[in-house]
Amino acid sequence: MVSNYNEKHIKVLKGLEPVRKRPGMYIGSTDTRGLHHLVWELFDNAVDEALNGSANKIEVVHKKDGSIIVTDNGRGIPVGKNLATNLSTVDTVYTVLHAGGKFDDQAYKVSGGLHGVGASVVNALSRKLIVTVHRDGGMYESIYQDGGKIIQPLKKVGNSTKHGTIVQFWPDPTIFKNIQFNPYMIKERLHESSFLFKGLKIVFVDENNPELSQTFIAKDGILEYLKYVNENKKSISKIIPFKGDYEKIVVDGCFQYTDNESELIISFANSVKTSEGGSHENGFKQAMLETINDYSKKYKLINNKDKGFDWSDLKEGLSVVLSVQVPEKIIAYEGQTKNKLFTQEVKVAVAKILTQQLFYFLEENQADAKQLIERFKLIKEAKEAAKKAKENTKKLKSAKSERVLYGKLTPAQQKNPLQNEIFLVEGDSAGGTAKSGRDKRFQAILPLRGKVVNVEKSRLQDLLKNEEILSIISCLGCGIGNNFNIKNLKYHKIIIMTDADTDGAHIQVLLLTFFYRYMKELIEQGKVYIALAPLYKISAKNSNKSAFAWDDYQLDELRTKYGSYEVQRYKGLGEMNSEQLWTTTMDPSKRQLIQVSIQNAAQAERKVSILMGDDASIRKNWINENVDFSIEE
């Protein structure tokens, strides 16, 4: 600690230095998620041109050299001099924080750009960035390097009959842990965005793998999106759309019920996904609940004296897509990265539009309305019965849970959830080795002896009869479903450790499906990991040297290094002794973990429904084709 705190300790960061000093404040993180956030920022800027009716085509290219190019056929960034900075407007937008057209509602009525810092933040975190503008009969270009330093100020490089903006950037390897873009992630995001704009042509080109290249045009907008999300589920209601505007806020939404037990709400504000929800989702829930209760009482489908339904009665099997367009002057988010919408006027707008249109739908489709309300009543009754049964058998269940855990869980010695981690280990054999090899201070071991149930094909009451699932719920301590509370979680890391084979991959998929359906926040908060065990041990014949390889590439390197050698292929965790398991898979300073995340809710929903549905052959084929049981570089 510095004792003589004085004037010299006050730093004034100039230009784009604040972004490079604290990138997490602007893009959330410097991992894979943060890296791709740069693409989303430039893409969102292009989408803003479409939002305002100035562009009908956007192209994103993943180049062989690792760079990304985003092109739109919008108006093109103005090329004249900016009076406030004495730089060209293009150079101002890309080198000055909080500069851009989004602050003037005459230029953009609505936008999704990151509070006027998106373009400059991408530049700040790139080793090189080139902007090309087609506007007013000319072609103009600016070049920046090493975090936004102007190498070539904007200059005219030719004539042009086109209009629009082209941005190419190379991420800075001194900022990001990994600068390899995931083309599948980019493609999924572009596909998702295409549903928000009827007729907008979005093109993805991958020069490294041309087969991934695809053009997206959605003719039916978000109705098409909801059909896409629910394609592999059994629907039990029509798709119910609602659309309108109130106080210059435009609302476009639709919802449907399926036979799935979980709730899915996918929401957007000015075309940007709001993964943490916010005021628009709150307005939807409020209006949905009030309208269903009012209609039910009006037509005596429930007793007027009854307090009615609550949200937990309505959310089972509900899929929603909700998009709002909010005037730039009133839009507000919680934080820079726009994951949660804050604007309270949006809640009012969504509620008013949905209330009016949903009530009209229910009155015009009374058979459908009655079917839905009967469903809500059954869910409510089942929930109340389950609550009574839970109270009556609380002691018995507690005793049973303790018996299930007894002899299974090997707890950590310390009790600090922020430091403790739990390994969910496939089989008794590996579980025993893990117990011997672990660090007893902070590592707990839970062997999974029996079969983990497929939660996608089981209802909650059946799920709770499975001893493996009960063990996991009891160990984690945070509850499931409506009773989930992450504050009660006993471990900051939940690590799935299975054999590197098809059976091991199947167990991983089953466990991840369980977490996704009933403890999704664990994944959203980055608490779930997959341990990567080595595939090979290579030993030199002429010495005591040995090493481990996680894939064939590493094995080939070691073969070249060792000359004369023996190779052991690990078929299961149990083939390693406790010291080897600790060194390769459990030691925090050496192990390799994959953090499980949900980048795209719609894709996750579709894949879970497909993989864990009734057709086991689909699941088996997917595992065989997509899981290579080695670390992703």
From Swiss-Prot:
- Residue numbers binding Mg(2+) 1: 426, 499
Residues that coordinate or bind Mg(2+) 2: 499, 501
- Keyword terms of this UniProt record: ATP-binding, DNA-binding, Isomerase, Magnesium, Metal-binding, Nucleotide-binding, Topoisomerase
* Reactions catalysed, as given in the entry: ATP-dependent breakage, passage and rejoining of double-stranded DNA
Annotated positions binding ATP: 5, 45, 72, 113-119, 338
- What does the record give as EC number? 5.6.2.2
A Pfam family this chain is assigned to: HATPase_c
Q: Which GO BP terms sit in this record?
A: DNA topological change
GO cellular component terms, alphabetically, are: chromosome
Q: Which residues belong to any copy of the Toprim domain?
A: 420-534
Query: Hey, where's the site called Interaction with DNA on this chain?
Result: 451, 454, 506, 619
Cofactor(s), by name: Mg(2+); Mn(2+); Ca(2+)
Keyword Magnesium belongs to the record: yes
Instruction: Identify the InterPro entries for this entry.
Output: DNA_gyrase_B_C (IPR002288), HATPase_C_sf (IPR036890), ParE_type2 (IPR005740), Ribosomal_Su5_D2-typ_SF (IPR020568), Ribsml_uS5_D2-typ_fold_subgr (IPR014721), Topo_IIA (IPR001241), Topo_IIA-like_dom_sf (IPR013760), Topo_IIA_B (IPR000565)
GO molecular-function annotation terms? Answer: ATP binding; DNA binding; DNA negative supercoiling activity; metal ion binding
Q: Which cysteine residues pair off into disulfide bonds?
A: none
The entry's free-text remark on the cofactor is: Binds two Mg(2+) per subunit. The magnesium ions form salt bridges with both the protein and the DNA. Can also accept other divalent metal cations, such as Mn(2+) or Ca(2+).
Question: What does the UniProt function comment say about this protein?
Answer: Topoisomerase IV is essential for chromosome segregation. It relaxes supercoiled DNA. Performs the decatenation events required during the replication of a circular DNA molecule.
Check the record and name the HAMAP family matching this protein: ParE_type2
Q: How does it assemble?
A: Heterotetramer composed of ParC and ParE.
This one is known as DNA topoisomerase 4 subunit B
Query: Which species expresses this protein natively?
Result: Mycoplasmoides gallisepticum (strain R(low / passage 15 / clone 2)) (Mycoplasma gallisepticum)
